[in-house]
Swiss-Prot record:
tr-type G domain location: 9-288
Function: Catalyzes the GTP-dependent ribosomal translocation step during translation elongation. During this step, the ribosome changes from the pre-translocational (PRE) to the post-translocational (POST) state as the newly formed A-site-bound peptidyl-tRNA and P-site-bound deacylated tRNA move to the P and E sites, respectively. Catalyzes the coordinated movement of the two tRNA molecules, the mRNA and conformational changes in the ribosome.
Family: Belongs to the TRAFAC class translation factor GTPase superfamily. Classic translation factor GTPase family. EF-G/EF-2 subfamily.
Location of the protein in the cell: Cytoplasm
Primary location recorded for the protein, binned into one broad class: cytoplasm
Listed name of the protein: Elongation factor G
Signal peptide: none
Organism encoding this protein: Chlamydia trachomatis serovar L2b (strain UCH-1/proctitis)
CC annotations in GO: cytoplasm
Length: 694
């Protein structure tokens, strides 16, 4: 099908999101199979899933990068992004949600809402992404559809409304009643569940289904209060309501985020996936439903609102970079307005750099087809962009617009890395540079004292996988040190400094004079450097050099050399020398000045605090809580159900190394835990002294 046949209202940009083992990739695989994109279904546990295309993903059976793919169903074009469920990869989820219009949340019928599902759900709330839910693995021992729906309401605050009623469960799961069409769907075993037949609702379920349908209709009546005709029908004659009417109100409720309809099935057994595809098209929004996108006009500084129209000015967001051994650097983009043509010259307005597009590709996991253009609403990939990274805006050269950025969290864990041989040094530098372009939560820095290269990321698994990729994709052999906590430094009061950098060594000297004021910035806002120089006391051409010097000075703190965060620096005064001043002198002076000001601003060390969730049998609860307290943990709350307790706590990362091993021995291997970065907090004085001594 060519793209011209699809209006904007027939495009669906959706994500599939879930906890690590809820069966998300399997669900996506089945969608690809039924929508005719793969001829043989890939199985995750055989390591053959189409969407899990990196070697490490196939070995570990988890999805690391969000693969993007396009399928066609019911006359609509669906772009699907499969997101990872492991907490170390939350930036992948965050950046795919930013460019989606709707999502399918997959839950495990046995465990319902798990800790990672909460994280992903919160991220989707942040971007206002409409969601429908799919309760998967209905064929597993202990599957409980209504229990899963209840846990969505309790733990996520979701308005979860069943639209299915399962027929049987565990090994007896044979199909479901569709509460909208009031038909029972039985999957035919001889087609491995790919086909089904419609029958009347079985007698033993009729009463339950009538109650559930009434609850569904009453809920829908509150979604659209302006639709009085629908409300009257619900109250007076619910049987006269047509399927079409229900779909219309349901679509409105889903798009406005007022309702989360819940379907059930077993993707692995092919049950319920086609029903899921139907409602993706019927209920989830098109780019038109999501409305205008906001941006800032760089020339005027004013907010602009861009209509989703293919004739409007170009505005696209780069949301992922991938390095491909054959094509080189691939940039994934979402187009919010306008049309992007192959070979065109465009502007990266975030970096103020011109770019040229050499090829446009439509992706299917890691297969690709060339395209001549992408237009509004499309998600696609471009080759040829040199400067663009995640979160950058691409626009027409004469229309300088910047879209809202994708925020990357600060890394929490560091490792030293060095090449095994001298010959690997160059290759290692290239590999680190390529990987940090792809992944904004992976940072590379140099320890000033030891000269070691330090890599930083969101957790041990994150850095492990990146190390694997270096060996496989870049053929680099490297040794890594033990994981260390990524501390930061900040200041706690306002201060100022006046610094002169003067060198006279025969011939031309060096002269720079800079006065700074610094103050603590809001937590999480990052560093800001502004120039308040007036009257040319420092000439305009030297200001960028001062700013660069200040930024470099902030890279290593004054207590223990950790990077400074949340510091606001104002360059307020200075002077220069006609002959001896240079960019170099002002850069060095800027760096010295900010260090001097920080020393006087009561600097402190910050440490990453993790949100830890432990699920443990109740008889081990006391031991688990005692152990978390010993690790300087702050218990946030606990809840119990079915002899299992869930504890949530905030614990410093430095106390959590090797936690899984000690948790196993505390609970005889029966407890599980997840951990995600929460925020940075001030280190207690005694521990700060120990860190500084090191």
């Amino acid at each position: 099908m060519s793209d011209q046949e699809f209006g904007l209202d027939a495009i669906r940009n959706i994500g599939i999101m879930a906890h690590i083992d809820a069966g998300k990739t399997t669900t996506t695989e089945r969608i690809l199979f039924y929508a005719g994109r793969t001829h043989k279904i890939g199985e995750v546990h055989e390591g053959g899933a189409t969407m899990d295309w990196m070697e490490q993903e196939q070995e570990r059976g988890i999805t690391i990068t969000s693969a993007a793919t396009t399928v066609f169903w019911l006359g609509a074009k669906i772009n699907i992004i499969d997101t990872p469920g492991h907490v170390d990869f939350t930036i992948e989820v965050e950046r795919s949600l930013r460019v989606l219009d709707g999502a399918v949340a997959v839950f495990d019928a046995v465990s319902g809402v798990e800790p990672q599902s909460e994280t992903v759900w919160r991220q989707a709330n942040k971007y206002g992404v409409p969601r429908i839910a799919f309760v998967n693995k209905m064929d597993r021992m202990g599957a409980n559809y209504f229990g899963a729906v209840e846990s969505m309401r309790e733990k996520l605050g979701a308005n979860a409304i069943p639209v299915h009623c399962p027929i049987g469960s565990e090994s007896q799961f044979v199909g479901m009643v569709d509460l909208i069409s009031q038909k029972a769907l039985y999957f035919l075993e001889e087609t491995l569940g790919a086909k089904w037949e419609e029958r009347e609702i079985p007698e033993d379920l009729q009463e339950q289904c009538a109650t559930l349908r009434m609850q569904l209709l009453e809920e829908l009546a509150t979604v659209d209060e302006s639709n009085e005709a629908f409300m009257e029908k619900v109250l007076e004659n619910p049987d006269s309501i047509t399927e079409e009417e229900i779909h219309t109100v349901m679509r409105k409720g889903v798009i406005e985020g007022k309702i989360n309809p819940v379907l059930c099935g077993s993707a692995f057994k092919n049950k319920g996936v086609q029903q899921l595809l139907d409602v993706i098209v019927k209920w989830l929004p098109s780019p038109l439903d999501r409305g205008n996108v906001r941006g800032i006009n760089l020339k005027t500084g004013e907010e602009v609102s861009l209509k989703p129209s293919k004739d409007g000015p170009l505005a696209a967001l780069a949301f992922k970079i991938m390095t491909d051994p054959y094509v080189g650097r691939i940039t994934f983009i979402r187009i919010y307005s306008g049309t992007l043509k192959k070979g065109s010259a465009i502007l990266n307005s975030t970096k103020d750099k011109k770019e040229r597009i050499s090829r446009l590709l439509e992706m299917h996991a890691n297969e690709r087809t060339d395209r001549d253009e992408f237009t509004v609403g499309d998600i696609g990939a471009c080759v040829g962009l040199k400067f663009s990274v995640t979160g950058d805006t691409l626009c027409d050269e004469n229309q300088e617009i910047v879209l809202e950025r994708i925020e990357a969290p600060e890394p929490v864990i560091d490792m030293a890395i060095e090449p095994k041989s001298k010959g690997d040094r160059e290759k290692l530098a290239q590999a680190l540079s390529a990987l940090s372009e792809e992944d904004p939560t992976f940072r590379v820095s140099t320890n000033e004292e030891t000269g070691q290269t330090i890599i930083s990321g969101m957790g041990e698994l994150h850095l492990d996988i990146l190390r694997d990729r270096m060996i496989r994709e870049f053929r680099v052999e490297a040794n890594v040190g033990k994981p260390q906590v990524s501390y930061k430094e900040t200041i706690t009061k306002t201060s100022n400094s006046e610094t002169k950098y003067v060198k006279q060594s025969g011939g031309r000297g060096q002269y720079a004079h800079v006065c700074l004021e610094i103050e603590p910035n809001e937590p999480g806002k990052g560093n800001e450097v502004v120039s308040k120089i007036v009257g040319g006391v420092i000439p305009k051409e030297y200001i960028p050099a001062v700013i660069k010097g200040v930024e470099e000075g902030l890279n290593s703190g004054v207590l223990a050399g950790y990077g400074l965060v949340d510091v606001k620096v104002s360059i307020v005064f200075g002077s220069y020398h006609e002959v001896d001043s240079s960019e170099m002198a002002f850069k060095i002076c800027g760096s010295m000045a900010v260090k001097e000001a920080c020393r006087k601003a009561l600097p402190v060390i910050l440490e990453p605090i993790m949100k830890v969730t432990v699920i443990t049998p109740e008889d081990h609860l006391g031991d688990v809580i005692g152990d978390l307290n010993r690790r300087r943990g702050k218990i946030l709350g606990q809840e119990s159900s079915r002899n299992m307790a869930q504890v949530s706590a905030e614990v410093p990362l430095s106390e959590m190394f090797g936690y899984m091993t000690s948790l196993r021995s505390l609970t005889s291997g029966r407890a599980t835990s997840t951990m995600e970065p929460a925020f940075f907090a001030k280190v207690p004085q005694k521990i700060q002294e120990e860190i500084v001594k090191k």
